[in-house]
């Protein structure tokens, strides 16, 4: 959790004479408990609330803020209860909440808004756009991927991550090491 982010940003802002605005901060959380821990800590230690909160669900791409067993136990109904609880918590604090993770189309967007989210964040959906500076081969991997190609891997930080099955992941699974030093 980004518990000390306000302190890091304050140090940077204090070193910039003439700066007349503060940096907006938006922690990414994955549960009502994480939202509570971050907001209480920030308010107590830094007298600062997040400008908005991103609640990232278990269907997100990339690194995930969930344990493997939490992903295995995921159901849309369970997560909707969690998201609704986070929306309620954030509203009580006067903080807008942005829903993220697994938002695929307009129906998903409208559903999140109907639950009370202030907005949605999409990431994976934009990887293949012209504006994204990813390599064409990387974009093509997304476009060519089938549902069964999407796998859960253990990220370098030990948390689960969602990835497209490829030769690199197969080498990692076989025990090949890529880091030196």
Question: Model regions: which residues?
Answer:
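Active-site entrance/lid segments in N-terminal catalytic domains of soluble metabolic enzymes
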Residues: 1-93
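Conserved active-site-proximal phosphate/metal-binding subdomains
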Residues: 50, 58-98, 104-181
């Amino acid at each position: 959790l980004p518990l000390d982010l306000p302190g890091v940003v304050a140090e940077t802002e204090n070193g910039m004479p003439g700066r007349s605005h503060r940096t907006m901060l938006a922690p990414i959380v994955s549960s009502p408990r994480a939202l509570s821990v971050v907001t209480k800590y920030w308010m107590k230690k830094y007298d600062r609330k997040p400008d908005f909160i991103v609640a990232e669900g278990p269907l997100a791409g990339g690194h995930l803020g969930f344990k493997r067993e939490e992903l295995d136990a995921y159901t849309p109904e369970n997560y909707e209860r969690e998201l609704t609880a986070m929306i309620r918590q954030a509203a009580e604090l006067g903080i807008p909440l942005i829903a993220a993770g697994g938002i695929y189309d307009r129906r998903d967007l409208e559903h999140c808004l109907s639950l009370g989210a202030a907005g949605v964040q999409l990431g994976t959906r934009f990887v293949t756009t012209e504006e994204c500076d990813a390599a064409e081969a990387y974009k093509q991997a997304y476009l060519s991927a089938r549902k069964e190609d999407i796998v859960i891997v253990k990220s370098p930080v030990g948390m689960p991550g969602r990835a497209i099955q490829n030769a690199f992941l197969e080498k990692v699974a076989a025990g090949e090491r890529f880091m030196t030093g």
